[in-house]
Swiss-Prot record:
Transmembrane segments: none annotated. 2-oxoglutarate binds at R321. Residues 111-130 are annotated as: Disordered. This is 2-oxoglutarate-Fe(II) type oxidoreductase ppzC. Disulfide bonds: none annotated. Residues 220-330 form the Fe2OG dioxygenase domain. Pathway: Secondary metabolite biosynthesis. It comes from the Eukaryota. The lineage of its organism: Eukaryota, Fungi, Dikarya, Ascomycota, Pezizomycotina. Its cofactor is Fe(2+). GO terms for biological process: small molecule biosynthetic process. Binds 1 Fe(2+) ion per subunit. It catalyses: peramine + 2-oxoglutarate + O2 = 8-hydroxyperamine + succinate + CO2. Fe cation binds at H254, D256, H311.
Amino acid sequence: MATDTAVTGAPETTELRLASGNGPVTRTVLRTPVRDALPSEVPLIDISPIFSTCVADRKAVARKIHDAATNIGFFYIQNHRVPSQDIDLAYSASQDFFRQEMEVKVEADAKDGPFDSGYRGPGTQRVNPTEGADLRETYSILYDPMLDPTVPDPANIPEPASRFLHLGRAPFESTATLPHFKDAFVRYFQACLVLARALTRAFALSLDLPESAFDGKVQYPDASLEINFYPPISTGHAVSAPGDADTRVSIGSHTDFLLFTILWQDSNGGLQVLNREGQWIRAIPVEGTFVVNIGDYLQRVTNDKYVSTVHRAQNFSGRERVSMPFFWGFGMHESCQVLRNCCGEDEKSKYDEVKCVDWVSRRLGNLFDLSDKG
């Protein structure tokens, strides 16, 4: 792994190199043991008021989201209205899928590259080009308006949006060995759509915008549900920071590149967040919650007011781990530009307007580049 160690007294630091849509970037990381996050570092927010008819209640939650988004870029949410039964069914179905023989799983292979739904096997993805290939398997479902109850007739979607959409392309026919699989994931996907749209309006409020400010940009979103299967890492010890010997990652150090991510994780843990001080902290599983993290779009539109935070996963639990991230962003036909109210009088915009399809293409190109950049 490519890192440079600097001795500046105690503790030592190392430079973590990351791929981004703007080229390589670095973060300074403390070479200290990974520790559990404090409640103040990754706060728990009760979001039930965002479903209230009272705007004052919704604004109160938006203020808490604003604080979390500016300080760490990660927070837990509870009372999110995603039925526990839907979560349990999706989790059970994911375990059933990944425990099949490889020759069965590859029947659902994502054959058309990064813009396709389906299965990706071990060693096929590398989120961070200076770290090892991700030690995971995945199955993903891209946004399909045929699965979106808010779209009455996909045939009437305007062409600028429809050309980026994936109508009927999820390879559910290749999961026929698991009759319950499709129903479980469609139900969970639809529940995540509802939650993501509610959170989008809460984020708009958190920025002192009308609640509907982003509605048009997510009418036909760039969204995907991904299930990750992480076998236990067999090194026998967790490393404290990039650059230590025998470092292996379940998923490498990265930021998410859309608007935000809604993550469900099982009880085995493994998610680590790089805080502002440069220390890796564990976002341990909290029953009944999701983890929400800010993506690159929200950092860009807020002119760096909100933080798209570096994170990774290392499964040293000794057990199989499953996580189910739901990635949510503006439609691929939309663009992303800095909001006027996020620039002070003498503050310049740090980012040019970018087409969402161009941004996503750049980031996905890094994800599937398995060449050694170390």
